[in-house]
Amino acid sequence: MKKAFVKSYGCQMNAYDAARMADVLGAEGYTATDTVEDADVVVLNTCHIREKAAEKVYSELGRLRVLKGERKAQGLDTRIVVAGCVAQAEGAEIQARQPAVDVVVGPQSYHRLPDLLARSRERRVVDTEFPVEDKFDHLPRRRTLGASAFLTVQEGCDKFCAFCVVPYTRGAEVSRSVAAVLAEAEKLADGGVREITLIGQNVNAYHGDGPDGAPAGLADLVRAVAKIPGIARIRYTTSHPNDFDDALIRAHAEVPALMPYLHLPVQSGSDRILAAMNRKHTGDAYRRLIDRIRAARPDIALSSDFIVGFPGETDADFAETLRLVRDVGFESAFSFKYSTRPGTPAADRTDQVPEAVMAARLAELQALLDSQRHAYQRAAAGRVFDVLVEKRGRHPGQVAGKTPHLLAVQFDAAPHHIGQVVPVRITEAGSNSLFGELVSEAAAA
């Protein structure tokens, strides 16, 4: 029996794409394996957002080249596939640097994977075109489902932030129709999924065709998905502040299934740096938007992205970022040193910030963000949350799940609770997750 190993790097959309590639291969008779040494096909679904992520791929390819040679000596064939955004950006270079790679396929073409694998037996293949056909129309039914699932509703980005490669690797903004999204969501619900996360590079720019042919916004889509029987929870990511409209804010107040958690990247607190990044908003505009969202949903938990050391960033600029973090308060956040990406406007700037300065600023920012995260987790102790149980826990007799605010919880319970939403009292806050105890409905009330 043929086996496939799929490894994904980076964002939630990459996780979705990796799962769909596994489905495509499954429809061709491949079974999934967690052991790369056993795989007849190895797929690396790559991320190009930072240099470090791309170099990880090349390091992994070096190991796979050795593995491919060892399997060949045993009479076993191994096909190596590089997919995702590194593939899109560096297709020919990948094969030049690593001849062991058989297929390079971009994020819009992976529905062609079976054909590409067949062609690769004659010669190595690169497919990084943006095809006319919609890849979603060619994807098979999902084969493996859990309690929660990602669902791509929008791809690409038209914002062209000065540091970002996404518009070049994922293309212009494209939205799936409401009907197409609902059809996939209904299949997920039929398969036992209780929570759907609607994903896109700029998901709140969603403008898919609605039932009447007119463009629908993300708020319209959220309300439609919320009507599907069995779907108890809805989330969405990732958003841009400039596309956050009143309808979406109202949805947070009016749609019970829309969870009180929002990932809304700001990148910097300095207006000067935000302008240089081409973000087209200010720090105060972000603060005002957060105030409006919190007025609609006071218990909402916030997450964000931050870049330190963008070219030209001064100590005063960085201080503005720290001030914004203190003003807003975040449950969690992702923070990184600026990474030069070839082909982006920021890469050509001559005022790059020294590595040591970036490292010091990142450490200071992460210490502040960690203190906010730990305070948020400590405040959860003693409270009861509805937890969606997703899987078995770290230890025997435990299960693990997420609160509405996306906090991870471990607690003792039987595995038959997986897929259920149950009340859990938080008893302890750990460094990365909460611990709790299952309580009765009466006690929760």
UniProtKB/Swiss-Prot annotation:
GO molecular function per UniProt: 4 iron, 4 sulfur cluster binding; metal ion binding; N6-isopentenyladenosine methylthiotransferase activity
Catalytic reactions on record: N(6)-dimethylallyladenosine(37) in tRNA + (sulfur carrier)-SH + AH2 + 2 S-adenosyl-L-methionine = 2-methylsulfanyl-N(6)-dimethylallyladenosine(37) in tRNA + (sulfur carrier)-H + 5'-deoxyadenosine + L-methionine + A + S-adenosyl-L-homocysteine + 2 H(+)
CDD domains: Radical_SAM (cd01335)
Location(s), subcellular: Cytoplasm
Enzyme class: transferase
Cross-referenced PROSITE patterns: MTTASE_N, MTTASE_RADICAL, RADICAL_SAM, TRAM
Record note on cofactor: Binds 2 [4Fe-4S] clusters. One cluster is coordinated with 3 cysteines and an exchangeable S-adenosyl-L-methionine.
Keyword Lipid metabolism belongs to the record: no
Gene Ontology CC annotation, any one: cytosol
Record-linked InterPro entries: Elp3/MiaA/NifB-like_rSAM, Methylthiotransferase, Methylthiotransferase_CS, Methylthiotransferase_N, Methylthiotransferase_N_sf, MiaB_methiolase, rSAM, rSAM_horseshoe
EC identifiers of the protein: 2.8.4.3
Cofactor(s) listed in the protein's UniProt record: [4Fe-4S] cluster
Binding site for [4Fe-4S] cluster 2: 157, 161, 164
TM regions (residue ranges): none
Binding site for [4Fe-4S] cluster 1: 11, 47, 85
Keywords: 4Fe-4S, Cytoplasm, Iron, Iron-sulfur, Metal-binding, S-adenosyl-L-methionine, Transferase, tRNA processing
Entry's family note: Belongs to the methylthiotransferase family. MiaB subfamily.
Alphabetized HAMAP family for the sequence: tRNA_metthiotr_MiaB
Protein name as catalogued: tRNA-2-methylthio-N(6)-dimethylallyladenosine synthase
GN (gene name): miaB
